């Protein structure tokens, strides 16, 4: 009888709001494991790539981003474990690159898989870094939309812009060195595309009896 009461009480406790083990949804649990595992993959990949960096500028970018991602990983892991606001706020990533993109295509050698470790250079390292950051940015975006815990949702969504910034920093490095070239359309096509949209005019028409206004505060 006592065992039955304990089981019944345990089942009742599972439905009580505010219980630490019950403020995460099922999808959220799986997605958070993907997010945190993905972050570890980025950090591990950066650590493995570091030994091959030849350009000090790229090495500085790698180290700066690794340090930032580590700090945000700790915040995310803490928030997920406690289900509450983390002890530290999410940070803003400040890149060092200027925002000047070089447009146009220049002749370059076709890309192909490396045949030995000696073929690894800064262009390959920066490409691997960019792919890792882009993939994690996508994961954060998709996962944040599945979060039921408001603290975890805010922590994830706050990091998306920072990953965009880190990806842009790596792109600018690649672009400056000719590793990532940016083609452009001719002037006429660009002008036509820029003028393909016009501002929206007016507001939605009211529904009969003003029912569309009910419940809006």
UniProtKB/Swiss-Prot annotation:
The keyword Membrane does not apply. Transmembrane segments: none annotated. Pfam families: Coat_F. GO terms for biological process: sporulation resulting in formation of a cellular spore. Keywords: Sporulation. Coiled coil: none annotated. Residues 1-28 are annotated as: Disordered. It is found in: Spore coat. Its main location: other. Belongs to the CotF family. This is Spore coat protein F-like protein YhcQ. The gene is yhcQ.
């Amino acid at each position: 009888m006592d065992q039955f009461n304990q089981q019944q009480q345990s089942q009742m406790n599972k439905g009580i709001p505010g219980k630490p083990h019950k403020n995460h949804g099922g999808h959220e649990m799986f997605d958070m494991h993907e997010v945190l595992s993905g972050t570890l993959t980025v950090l591990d990949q950066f650590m493995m790539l570091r030994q091959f960096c030849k350009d000090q500028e790229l090495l500085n970018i790698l180290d700066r981003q690794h340090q930032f991602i580590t700090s945000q990983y700790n915040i995310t892991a803490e928030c997920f474990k406690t289900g509450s606001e983390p002890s530290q706020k999410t940070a803003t990533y400040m890149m060092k690159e200027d925002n000047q993109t070089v447009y146009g295509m220049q002749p370059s050698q076709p890309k192909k898989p490396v045949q030995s470790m000696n073929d690894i250079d800064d262009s390959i390292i920066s490409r691997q870094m960019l792919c890792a950051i882009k993939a994690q940015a996508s994961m954060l975006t998709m996962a944040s939309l599945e979060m039921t815990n408001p603290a975890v949702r805010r922590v994830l969504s706050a990091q998306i812009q920072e990953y965009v910034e880190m990806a842009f920093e790596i792109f600018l490095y690649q672009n400056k060195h000719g590793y990532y070239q940016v083609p452009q359309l001719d002037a006429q096509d660009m002008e036509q595309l820029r003028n393909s949209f016009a501002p929206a005019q007016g507001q939605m028409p009211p529904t009969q009896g003003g029912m569309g206004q009910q419940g809006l505060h």
